[in-house]
């Protein structure tokens, strides 16, 4: 049994305030893309959970988000069943694409089926919130407004890129530690986010994607670009190569851009290879 784990990008991302618990309240628009990892599993009757990757990992199994998701679902449901899990990893980690969170969300969906638990999405999203802020959205995917630390979700009808447009995602060789992104990021208060959300929701489906693509925004660019100029350079290269718009995703370091055709996006991907470790041409994924 297999499950697709689509990555995500942020079409809009603002930092509203720092909370007393040390976390930050955000306002963002999540969008899944038709690119990601694949999680497979086979049933075990002895209750054991094993995890194998297509490439070596250098951290303990107990700290792996896929393993944590499997154990959490097993404990929550009380099932005596286990699973042999295999993860085909394609998306880069720590790239602002939600790769690890997507894998955890896919694991929840997959084992819910394998163990015949019949949990609804809402229950899986609740469990996902215990694993990470992006996991609840990635249980369902598609298009959603998110607030709080990302756990307060308003799903909207999924959108798709207009016409023959394609998305190019590229990840530079530089990595952006989360602390670098949050250090110095401006806290805007709620006004910009609330205004953006209201205008986007008032638009119809076609108008809303046009509005979103014309109003791409990521507050983290202000704090990331000075410390990680390769990310800023990559965004500039996207625009030089003909992207209609471009933006850093999440807290970095990946950048995405929209091109009018698949061929244009593929050509740009070739041009970006010298300054990036990962490139993929894709479209939006409409969710589960």
Predicted regions and their residues:
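Contiguous, small/hydrophobic- and glycine-enriched helical/loop subdomains that border
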Residues: 104, 108-145
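Short beta-strand scaffold segments in enzyme catalytic cores
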Residues: 13, 37-41, 134-138, 144-145, ...
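Glycine/serine-rich anion-binding loops at beta->alpha junctions
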Residues: 86-115, 133, 243-259
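Short, basic/glycine-rich phosphate-binding loops at helix/coil junctions
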Residues: 45-59, 107, 207-217
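Solvent-exposed alpha-helices and their adjacent loops that cap or buttress functional pockets
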Residues: 31-32, 129-130, 136-139, 157-163, ...
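Conserved, helical-rich catalytic subdomain that frames metal- and/or nucleotide-binding sites
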Residues: 140, 145-245, 260-273, 277-288
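ATP-binding N-lobe of GHMP and related small-molecule kinases
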Residues: 1-95, 113-125, 160-161, 171-174
């Amino acid at each position: 049994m297999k499950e697709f784990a689509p990555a995500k990008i942020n079409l809009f991302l603002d930092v509203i305030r720092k909370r007393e618990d040390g976390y930050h309240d955000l306002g963002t628009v999540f969008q899944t893309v038709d690119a990601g990892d694949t999680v497979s599993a086979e049933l075990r009757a002895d209750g054991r959970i094993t995890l194998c990757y297509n490439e070596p990992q250098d951290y303990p199994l107990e700290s792996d988000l896929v393993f944590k998701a499997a154990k959490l679902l097993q404990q929550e449901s009380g099932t005596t069943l286990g699973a042999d899990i295999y993860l085909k990893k394609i998306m880069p980690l720590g790239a602002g694409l939600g790769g690890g969170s997507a894998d955890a969300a896919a694991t929840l969906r997959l084992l819910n089926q394998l163990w015949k638990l019949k949990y609804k999405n809402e229950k899986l999203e609740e469990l996902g919130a215990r694993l990470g802020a992006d996991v609840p959205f990635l249980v369902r995917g598609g298009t959603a407004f998110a607030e709080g630390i990302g756990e307060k979700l308003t799903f909207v009808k999924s959108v798709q890129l207009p016409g023959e447009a394609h998305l190019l995602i590229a990840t530079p060789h530089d990595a952006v530690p989360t602390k670098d992104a949050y250090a110095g990021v401006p806290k805007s208060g709620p006004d910009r986010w609330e205004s953006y959300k209201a205008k986007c929701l008032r638009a119809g489906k076609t108008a809303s994607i046009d509005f979103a693509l014309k109003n791409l925004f990521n507050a983290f660019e202000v704090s990331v670009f000075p410390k990680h100029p390769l990310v800023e350079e990559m965004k500039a290269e996207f625009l030089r190569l003909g992207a209609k718009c471009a933006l850093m995703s999440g807290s970095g370091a990946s950048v995405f851009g929209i091109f009018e055709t698949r061929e244009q996006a593929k050509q740009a991907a070739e041009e970006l290879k010298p300054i990036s470790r990962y490139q993929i041409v894709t479209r939006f994924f409409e969710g589960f």
